[in-house]
Amino acid sequence: MDRQKEFVLRTLEERDIRFVRLWFTDVLGFLKSVAIAPAELEGAFEEGIGFDGSSIEGFARVSESDTVAHPDPSTFQVLPWATSSGHHHSARMFCDITMPDGSPSWADPRHVLRRQLTKAGELGFSCYVHPEIEFFLLKPGPEDGSVPVPVDNAGYFDQAVHDSALNFRRHAIDALEFMGISVEFSHHEGAPGQQEIDLRFADALSMADNVMTFRYVIKEVALEEGARASFMPKPFGQHPGSAMHTHMSLFEGDVNAFHSADDPLQLSEVGKSFIAGILEHACEISAVTNQWVNSYKRLVQGGEAPTAASWGAANRSALVRVPMYTPHKTSSRRVEVRSPDSACNPYLTFAVLLAAGLRGVEKGYVLGPQAEDNVWDLTPEERRAMGYRELPSSLDSALRAMEASELVAEALGEHVFDFFLRNKRTEWANYRSHVTPYELRTYLSL
């Protein structure tokens, strides 16, 4: 048995852990969990835990549903919730999903991302990610479709006396850091009740695990604080939606492959081609980075979110931004993709972003001129004249672009690609047939 497994088993005994929660994610990004007793973990390390894959969104047909979860000891963390006596009785690990013969499950989002990271490794790169995760903190209420109520009326960077959101963020960060998830900073975002917590850079697979843990922790802490948290992309029509701005960089060993001291923006040819790849394939990957009907209520003109495939230095109206906070710091040269929302599947999102960027690097895509103006203020004609393609404005148009994409099919694999399209086509059809309160208010008098 390797040292990581021995460490986990020893920690369970020393800290008297009573429950080990084995986590994995379905294709749509929902967290799944099975709890086992510590005495069963050594066997789980050796043989895995069998489950019905046909009961998990996108995993398997009922006729071939035997699936196995293998805990990854490198992801072991004690959960931060304690009993009244202060005893932390539960821990968690993420799992890799396989078929009974030991082959990887093509439906496992971790496997989808790992395949892209392997491809990056074959090109000599490792990928690091730093997300800015936004969400809403709401007052308790029924989940019956009624209008939610934010916990406050604060705005961007606001500091209030007896600020419930401030207390919430402090408790959430304590819980995250207890689990070894480093937080860079946190603050109130622009809309009432809207929060942002930024996680410190990590390798892409660890970060996807961290994002899933983050969403779980945030919801748990919100309940403890007498509130509820929502990662819905756009719960309020009159306010900005919740993004997951995704900062990415490629490293060759310890060297940032995106940095060049000779460039005015300190951006290397690798970095430029990576951005060009994101822009070229932006429409194709939108259904993954923004997977819900509601996602496209956020990606609208004036909504503080990108609507065209453009890039710029320090330009927050562009799809891809090159942050310029520390222009001469080699390790910090990165690109920020501003379209993903915080309700995406982080494994699939990082996979398609990496696939698009690597395609640009492999094929030597040439990056066009940067956007120096506010892209939101440009007319459609001006955008076309500048070569900025419009991003999909609905889930339907995003699915059409994805369906024709060889890149996304290759990045996700045939199984996930086909399931995702079928599932999202059903979601769109259900939405189209639904009569909304807006329609009743507007058209009932006809």
UniProtKB/Swiss-Prot annotation:
GO terms for cellular component: cytoplasm; plasma membrane. Its EC number is 6.3.1.2. GO terms for biological process: glutamine biosynthetic process. There is a cross-link at residue 363 (Isoglutamyl lysine isopeptide (Lys-Gln) (interchain with Q-Cter in protein Pup)). Its cofactor is Mg(2+). It catalyses: L-glutamate + NH4(+) + ATP = L-glutamine + ADP + phosphate + H(+). GO terms for molecular function: ATP binding; D-glutaminase activity; glutamine synthetase activity; metal ion binding. SUPFAM superfamilies: Glutamine synthetase, N-terminal domain (SSF54368), Glutamine synthetase/guanido kinase (SSF55931). Residues 15-102 form the GS beta-grasp domain. PROSITE patterns: GLNA_ATP, GS_BETA_GRASP, GS_CATALYTIC. It is found in: Cytoplasm. PANTHER family: GAMMA-GLUTAMYLPOLYAMINE SYNTHETASE GLNA2, GAMMA-GLUTAMYLPUTRESCINE SYNTHETASE. Oligomer of 12 subunits arranged in the form of two hexagons. In its feedback-inhibited form, interacts with TnrA in order to block its DNA-binding activity. Glutamine synthetase (GS) is an unusual multitasking protein that functions as an enzyme, a transcription coregulator, and a chaperone in ammonium assimilation and in the regulation of genes involved in nitrogen metabolism. It catalyzes the ATP-dependent biosynthesis of glutamine from glutamate and ammonia. Feedback-inhibited GlnA also interacts with and regulates the activity of the transcriptional regulator TnrA. During nitrogen limitation, TnrA is in its DNA-binding active state and turns on the transcription of genes required for nitrogen assimilation. This is Glutamine synthetase. The lineage of its organism: Bacteria, Bacillati, Actinomycetota, Actinomycetes, Mycobacteriales. The gene is glnA2.
